[in-house]
Each structure stands twice: as structure tokens, then as C-alpha cells.
């Protein structure tokens, strides 16, 4: 097949153009550590294969109960919940904890690494006692989540990705947490705090500093995710069994 000189020159130009972009992309990825903490492990004094970790006797019993939920010979299916158990015990997941999970479940360590590096809910770096996760995806952003993030940073004196010197708070941004109807919202450890204002999040932080756990849920007075102006349907308790059924049936 023959191409004109102009077409060949155009193709060569496009190849060079995209080649530069690919090279720049690869260079950027390498500079950032191929995804930073997500994909790369480098031994540190606090995170290496010799970092002490073992499950407590109570958690070994929990692991036995978890494994029983899966068919015999399929312990590998329990990797996610057992990793979560390790994180709850230790606060985060050093590589030694991943190795222990692999040992307990009798799977290759790589199978555990694959899971721990894929899901961002696993913390592969130490985090504070209270892990503040601010949703900044579109619905929350449209409901002024930026003001929530700014208020937290100002209140704690830290930036996104940082931990307070007293190790009490870690602040990160996250993608959608599935509570768009209650935007803006944040997740702190396992709890959702919704319908927030800057004042609300400051009060929540004050309570946490005082050692109290604020009541989760909407801060606007809503019970759940009903319309802000009040219920428009389902305004009374549901009828009992048999309601509306033809007599005699």
C-alpha cells in the first residue's frame, strides 16, 4: 500500500507527538513512585517484613468464624475481611500484617498484596486515631464541600494527606462515598456525618478532641435522606400484614 508524502509526514508527526506524551507520562509515573503508596512498597524502619505483627487470640477466633463463611478449600475468599481485621487491630497495614494474613489463609503473599494495593480503604501508611475522609466528588462539590475541607484544614492546621503532630487526626480527600443525597458529607473512621456546614465539622472535631464520638448521620435535622422540605410520600407508618387483601383470601 502506498501513501502520499504528505500523509506519511502527517503520520510521522502524530507518532512523534504522542510519543512525547507517552514518554512524559512514564517519566511522571516514575517520579511519583508508580502511584505512590498505592502500588509500591519500600522498606522503612516502621514498615518492613520484620515489623512485629500478630493477631490477638480474640482475632484468631474471629478469623476462624470468618473462614467458616466460605466453602472448604476457599480460604483465599476471606482475604478482604481478614485484612480489614488486621487493620482494625493495628490501625493500618504494614507489610508484615499482609504477610501474616497470607500465612493464616495459606495463600501466596502476592495474593494479599494485590488486594491491599487495589482497595484504597486499606491504609498502607500510619493514620491518626480519627481518619477524616472528605468526599469532594461532583455532588458534594456542588454542595460546597470545598468549604468543609477548608474548615478542617484551618481547624487542625494540616493539609490533605497529613496527620496532626499528636497523631489524633489524618485528613484525606476521597471519591464518592454513596451519600450524595446528604451532601456535603465526610466519613470519620466508620461513621458518616452528613448535611454539613463548616460550623458542623468544627463542632464534630471539638467533640472528637474531647474524647466523645459525635452522633453520626445528618446534621440538618433530617432523619435520613428525606426531602429537605419534609416528606412528600410515606408520611405515615406502613399498614400491617393483610392490608388491602380481598376478604376471604
Swiss-Prot record:
It is found in: Mitochondrion inner membrane. Its EC number is 7.1.1.2. It comes from the Eukaryota. Residues 213-249 are annotated as: Disordered. Residues 1-32 form a transit peptide. Binds 1 [2Fe-2S] cluster. Its main location: mitochondrion. It is a peripheral membrane protein. [2Fe-2S] cluster binds at residues 135, 140, 176, 180. The modification Phosphotyrosine is found at residue 193. Core subunit of respiratory chain NADH dehydrogenase (Complex I) which is composed of 45 different subunits. This is a component of the flavoprotein-sulfur (FP) fragment of the enzyme. It is linked to Mitochondrial complex I deficiency, nuclear type 7: A form of mitochondrial complex I deficiency, the most common biochemical signature of mitochondrial disorders, a group of highly heterogeneous conditions characterized by defective oxidative phosphorylation, which collectively affects 1 in 5-10000 live births. Clinical disorders have variable severity, ranging from lethal neonatal disease to adult-onset neurodegenerative disorders. Belongs to the complex I 24 kDa subunit family. NCBIfam families: nuoE_fam, PRK07539.1-2, PRK07539.1-5. This is NADH dehydrogenase [ubiquinone] flavoprotein 2, mitochondrial. It comes from Homo sapiens. The lineage of its organism: Eukaryota, Metazoa, Chordata, Craniata, Vertebrata.
Amino acid at each position: 500500500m502506498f501513501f502520499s508524502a504528505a500523509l506519511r509526514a502527517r503520520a510521522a508527526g502524530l507518532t512523534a507527538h504522542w510519543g512525547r506524551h507517552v514518554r512524559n507520562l512514564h517519566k511522571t509515573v516514575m517520579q511519583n513512585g508508580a502511584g505512590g503508596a498505592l502500588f509500591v512498597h519500600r522498606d522503612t524502619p516502621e514498615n518492613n517484613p520484620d515489623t512485629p505483627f500478630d493477631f490477638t487470640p480474640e482475632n484468631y477466633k474471629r478469623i476462624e468464624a470468618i473462614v467458616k463463611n466460605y466453602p472448604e478449600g476457599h480460604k483465599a475468599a476471606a482475604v478482604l475481611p481478614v485484612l480489614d481485621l488486621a487493620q482494625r487491630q493495628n490501625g493500618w497495614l504494614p507489610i508484615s500484617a499482609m504477610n501474616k494474613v497470607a500465612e493464616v489463609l495459606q495463600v501466596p503473599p502476592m495474593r494479599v498484596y494485590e488486594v491491599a494495593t487495589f482497595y484504597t480503604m486499606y491504609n498502607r501508611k500510619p493514620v491518626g486515631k480519627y481518619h477524616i475522609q472528605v468526599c469532594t466528588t461532583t455532588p458534594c462539590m456542588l454542595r460546597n464541600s470545598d468549604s468543609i475541607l477548608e474548615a478542617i484544614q484551618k481547624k487542625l492546621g494540616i493539609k490533605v494527606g497529613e496527620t496532626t503532630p499528636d497523631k489524633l487526626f489524618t485528613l484525606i480527600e476521597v471519591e464518592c462515598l454513596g451519600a450524595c443525597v446528604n451532601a456535603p458529607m465526610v466519613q470519620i473512621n466508620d461513621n458518616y456525618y452528613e448535611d454539613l456546614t463548616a460550623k458542623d465539622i468544627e463542632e464534630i472535631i471539638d467533640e472528637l478532641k474531647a474524647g466523645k464520638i459525635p452522633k453520626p448521620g445528618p446534621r440538618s435535622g433530617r432523619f435520613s435522606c428525606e426531602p429537605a422540605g419534609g416528606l412528600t410520600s410515606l408520611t405515615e407508618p406502613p399498614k400491617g400484614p393483610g392490608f388491602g387483601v380481598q376478604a376471604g383470601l
